[in-house]
Amino acid sequence: MEGVGLRAVGSHCSLSEMDDLDLTRALDKPRLKIERKRSFDERSMSELSTGYSRHDGIHDSPRGRSVLDTPLSSARNSFEPHPMMAEAWEALRRSMVFFRGQPVGTLAAVDNTTDEVLNYDQVFVRDFVPSALAFLMNGEPDIVKHFLLKTLQLQGWEKRVDRFKLGEGVMPASFKVLHDPIRETDNIVADFGESAIGRVAPVDSGFWWIILLRAYTKSTGDLTLSETPECQKGMKLILSLCLAEGFDTFPTLLCADGCSMIDRRMGVYGYPIEIQALFFMALRSALSMLKPDGDGREVIERIVKRLHALSFHMRNYFWLDHQNLNDIYRFKTEEYSHTAVNKFNVMPDSIPEWVFDFMPLRGGYFVGNVGPAHMDFRWFALGNCVSILSSLATPDQSMAIMDLLEHRWAELVGEMPLKICYPCLEGHEWRIVTGCDPKNTRWSYHNGGSWPVLLWQLTAACIKTGRPQIARRAVDLIESRLHRDCWPEYYDGKLGRYVGKQARKYQTWSIAGYLVAKMLLEDPSHIGMISLEEDKLMKPVIKRSASWPQL
């Protein structure tokens, strides 16, 4: 950060001896009441197909509320809220973490049924996102602001894993607050991937940080945070890791296994859909917050160019529907020159048998991965939902994803929303791809397990596409079991019928995901903080090659 410089640390970073960056001092200005104009809102809410009334100004959040107050969402509705709502709020508040008297995040889980804590007593960046959205929707932005500032401090340090120095823009995967009752001090220890199962840096943390910064700005109307030199620099550092020129011939990001929510070896190395969708959303979010002064103008120009290329690439080469599947089935191979139709030399014989039965005549989705001679046909829920929210998916593609969910409800939702991926890996394929991972056995954990946290992303995607009835159906399933099962981390089985064999109870993002989904359904105007409308000026003209087969 400006004026602070970098500090060399070991494999763990600690705040114990470092004076706090007093970023909040520069932010102690009266919040601006901003009348949202069309240019700020990207597109009027009335243009959404949901049929809900337009939410014109910035969502007004009552000031001076304590984080222990009664949820506003309950008071805003004329009907009696589900009993789970109050209990979910109590559980969420129990997970709050304080640093020197200020709330800075929520623990991954508060499971008192086991003595094995592992790393669930830490604040994970990706895990905190639904908690942050719940607090923002409830008019409690302070915890989100403190979290953004605290993680920004951690980004500013020099980071080393063994003898290797990580990029300056890398955000932590998680951090832990250590309380010393004798000295009455609080210290922070951060993990940048050196303590993770696969020792992989979290690629998604920086993207979620930018997306959350925009959500905070949209929810509160407080531009002073995103416009500080520190936040401006933080965004640029994150993007500098992604926009650097190298040997890439694709606009997508090349990633290792285990760098995102799927944090174990699951065959997603290469160009996973989750990272590409988050990358696209982070680019668009940053574009709305970066100031065009100094080097900001150059960064903005690079973002715009990358967005053009990335949207074209993803919409053409990652998209799969019945027609595209038939085209790939008929592909010729070993094509050379720029006129090649099978640009990645995907072998038709590599198409798995299950996808022919899985693909309906109406519907489609973004496949899990596309690279040289490689196409991962698995469905990944997070990547497809974020593609809708970020408008990486065109309106037609967004509707097709929703059609697929309805057609394949039993497979993708079953008895507990939502399958993180489909189908599972099993047998010889499981042994080769996962390395015989005992946690990722068939229909468990990241290998086809069902994750309640994905409910909020599903609900947001449903509202944006005008299909809230799909979300309500999923919420009904959640309300029939989640509280009774003590808010588990994930469910196992082909239908998601069984609590996961290693699932933590009272998993915070399962709790927060439910709250966000309920509040979105109660007040669909909240969608504005986590949704980006299609940018007509950015939208490229998509044309297929003249040699593309006409079937």
UniProtKB/Swiss-Prot annotation:
One of its GO terms (cellular component) is nucleus. Disruption phenotype: Reduced primary root length and increased length and number of lateral roots. Reduced plant growth and early flowering. Reduced seedling levels of glucose and fructose, but increased levels of sucrose. It catalyses: Hydrolysis of terminal non-reducing beta-D-fructofuranoside residues in beta-D-fructofuranosides. It is found in: Cytoplasm, Cytosol; Nucleus. Optimum pH is 7.0-8.0. Optimum temperature is 9 degrees Celsius. The modification Phosphoserine is found at S11, S14, S44, S61, S547. Keywords: Acetylation, Carbohydrate metabolism, Cytoplasm, Glycosidase, Hydrolase, Nucleus, Phosphoprotein. Its EC number is 3.2.1.26. The modification Phosphothreonine is found at T70. InterPro entries: 6-hairpin_glycosidase_sf, 6hp_glycosidase-like_sf, Glyco_hydro_100. Residues 50-74 are annotated as: Disordered. The modification N-acetylmethionine is found at M1. Residues 53-63 have a biased composition (Basic and acidic residues). Phosphorylated at Ser-547 by CPK3 and CPK21. Belongs to the glycosyl hydrolase 100 family. Forms homohexamers. Interacts with PIP5K9. Interaction with PIP5K9 represses CINV1 activity. Interacts with GRF1, GRF2, GRF3, GRF4, GRF5, GRF6, GRF7, GRF8 and GRF10; these interactions are dependent of the phosphorylation at Ser-547. Cytosolic invertase that specifically cleaves sucrose into glucose and fructose and is involved in the regulation of multiple tissue development including primary root elongation, root hair growth, leaf and silique development, and floral transition. Is involved in osmotic stress-induced inhibition on lateral root growth by controlling the concentration of hexose in cells. May regulate sugar-mediated root development by controlling sucrose catabolism in root cells. Contributes to carbon partitioning and cellulose biosynthesis in seedlings. This is Alkaline/neutral invertase CINV1. The lineage of its organism: Eukaryota, Viridiplantae, Streptophyta, Embryophyta, Tracheophyta.
